[in-house]
Regions:
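Bacterial Sec-dependent N-terminal signal peptides
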Residues: 1-21
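Mid-chain, structured segments of secreted extracytoplasmic proteins
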Residues: 62-105
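Exposed loop/turn and edge beta-strand positions of beta-sandwich/beta-sheet ligand-binding modules
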Residues: 58, 86, 127
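Short beta->alpha transition motifs characteristic of CBS
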Residues: 124, 144-147
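Core segments of cupin and vicinal oxygen chelate
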Residues: 30-71
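Vicinal oxygen chelate
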Residues: 33-36, 90-137
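N-terminal beta-strand motif that seeds the catalytic metal site of vicinal oxygen chelate
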Residues: 17-36, 88-92
C-alpha cells in the first residue's frame, strides 16, 4: 500500500518536470581556425544574421542566428582540428531548394549526395531532396527541402 501511495505522489512530480522543464535547442558552437572566413561563410552563403557576442572575446568569437532563432557560435582556435565524418553534420531546411543550389553554384561551393557524387542531389525514400557540403573549416552541412 505504501508503494502505491508513493507512486501516486511521485507521478505528478515526474509529469511536471517533463512538461515544464523540457530542453530547447539554443546554439551550436564550432571551433574554427579562420574566424573571418568561416564567419563570412555563415553570413553570406547560408544567410545567417550576425548577432552581438554575449560573452568574453577571449578567445575571439562571432555569433550568428538563423531566421528561426537557431544560433551558431564560431570560436577561434589555433589548434589543428581533426576532420569530421559526414555522419556528424548539421541539417537545415530551405523553402526554395533550387534557389539555394544556384547560390552554392554561384559561389563555387561543391555539394553532393550522401555517397559524395559531386553536384548530385540525394532523393530520399520519403521524397525529400538533400545535399551535403562543407563549410571552410570542414564541418559537414546538410540542406534539404523538408517543410
Amino acid at each position: 500500500m505504501k508503494k502505491i501511495i508513493f507512486l501516486l505522489l511521485i507521478i505528478p512530480i515526474i509529469k511536471y518536470g517533463q512538461n515544464n522543464n523540457s530542453l530547447k535547442f539554443n546554439h551550436q558552437a564550432l571551433l574554427v581556425n579562420d574566424l573571418n572566413q568561416s564567419g563570412d561563410f555563415y553570413n553570406n552563403i547560408l544567410g545567417f544574421e550576425e548577432i552581438e557576442v554575449g560573452a568574453s572575446q577571449k578567445p575571439p568569437k562571432r555569433w550568428f542566428k538563423s531566421d528561426d532563432g537557431m544560433e551558431i557560435h564560431l570560436i577561434s582556435t589555433k589548434e589543428k582540428l581533426k576532420s569530421i565524418p559526414k555522419g556528424v553534420h548539421m541539417a537545415f531546411s530551405v523553402k526554395n531548394f533550387d534557389l539555394f543550389i544556384n547560390n552554392l553554384k554561384g559561389n563555387n561551393i561543391t555539394y553532393g549526395n550522401w555517397r559524395g557524387d559531386e553536384n548530385q542531389i540525394q532523393l530520399r525514400n520519403d521524397g525529400y531532396k538533400q545535399i551535403f557540403f562543407q563549410d571552410p573549416q570542414g564541418y559537414w552541412i546538410e540542406v534539404n527541402n523538408i517543410k
